[in-house]
Amino acid sequence: MAGHSKWANIQHRKGRQDAARSKLFSKLSKEITVAAKMGDPDPEKNPRLRLAVKEAKSNSVPKDVIDRAIKKATGGDAENYDEIRYEGYGPNGVAVIVETMTDNKNRTASTVRSTFSKNGGNLGETGSVGFMFERKGEVTYPASVGDADTVMMAAIEAGAEDVESSEDGHVIFCADTDLNEVSNALEAELGESESTKLIWKPTTTTELDLEGMQKLMKLVDALEDDDDVQRVTTNFEASDEVMAQL
C-alpha cells in the first residue's frame, strides 16, 4: 500500500483523537465556508462545496455544523481567507506539502517556517517539492462494495485512471478536473463513497525506518496543530513492519 494510504491508518491509531477531531471539524467547516463564499451556496451547483460537504459528512461532522458553515458564507460575516501552499523537506529528506487557509499571511508563513525548523525539516520555495506529486482526484470505497475486478470495471466505466485495491478497501484515482464527474458515475454504480477529495499523489517516495517515521509524525502533528493548516501531504514510504510499531 502506498504511503499516502498508510498515513490515514496511523492517524486512526493515534491517541490524540478527541482534540484532533475538534480541530478537524473546524478545518472542514472553514473549507465549506470558503467554498460557499466563492461560488453558489447550493452544493449541487457548486462542485467544490459539494466535495467539502461530502468530506465533512464522511468525517461525521454534524449536519447543523455544516449548515452553519454555509450560512456563515451567505450571511456576509465570513472572514476573507487566502489559500497558500507551502513546500519543504521533513526529516530524512521527505517531501512535504502544506496547504493553508489564512487571514494573516505573515503569521502563517512565520509559524510554518518555524515548525519545519524545530522538527528537523526546512521550508523551501513553492515548487521545490511539488514536482514529486501529481494533483489527482481520489475516491475511496470499503472492501465490502465488491472485489477488485468489480471495482476496476466500475472505475474504467466512470473514466477513472487507476485503482488500488487491498483488504482495507479500494482507492480510485482520476484527473483532478474529472473528480466530480467520476465520483457521480461511481456512486451510481457502487453507492456512496467513503470519501471523495482532491489530493497530492506522490510520484516518487522516500523510504523511512521506524526512527524516521517517528520524526516525520512529530513534524506533521505540529503542522496540523496550526489552525491555519488545512492539510499536510508527504511522500513517505514505510514497510508494514515499521507501520505496525507506530
From Swiss-Prot:
It is found in: Cytoplasm. It holds the Pfam family Transcrip_reg. InterPro entries: Integrase-like_N (IPR017856), TACO1_YebC-like_2nd/3rd_dom (IPR048300), TACO1_YebC_N (IPR049083), Transcrip_reg_TACO1-like (IPR002876), Transcrip_reg_TACO1-like_dom3 (IPR026564), YebC-like (IPR029072). SUPFAM superfamilies: YebC-like. GO terms for molecular function: DNA binding. Residues 1-21 are annotated as: Disordered. Its main location: cytoplasm. One of its GO terms (cellular component) is cytosol. The keyword Cytoplasm applies. Disulfide bonds: none annotated. It comes from the Bacteria. GO terms for biological process: regulation of DNA-templated transcription. Keywords: Cytoplasm, DNA-binding, Transcription, Transcription regulation. Belongs to the TACO1 family. This is Probable transcriptional regulatory protein TM1040_1893. The lineage of its organism: Bacteria, Pseudomonadati, Pseudomonadota, Alphaproteobacteria, Rhodobacterales.
